[in-house]
């Protein structure tokens, strides 16, 4: 988990902003949302295949 040290004279708002940026960069919030509910392995496979298909279509469209 990312941690920050509050600098001397730094406001709480700016420290909170740095912390939010660090957690977003580490992908913690997206990981929490992903693990919030159980997802069956078959559903995971379908989502993964759909994402791969979208990437392929996007790549093919970009090459033209």
Curated annotation (Swiss-Prot):
Family named by the database record: Belongs to the bacterial ribosomal protein bS21 family.
Keyword Cytoplasm: no
PANTHER family hit by this protein: MITOCHONDRIAL 28S RIBOSOMAL PROTEIN S21, SMALL RIBOSOMAL SUBUNIT PROTEIN BS21
Top-rank taxon: Bacteria
Protein name: Small ribosomal subunit protein bS21
Pfam families linked to this entry: Ribosomal_S21
Residues spanning the membrane: none
GO cellular component: ribonucleoprotein complex; ribosome
GO process annotations (BP): translation
Ribonucleoprotein found in the keyword field: yes
The entry's keywords: Ribonucleoprotein, Ribosomal protein
Lineage: Bacteria, Pseudomonadati, Myxococcota, Myxococcia, Myxococcales
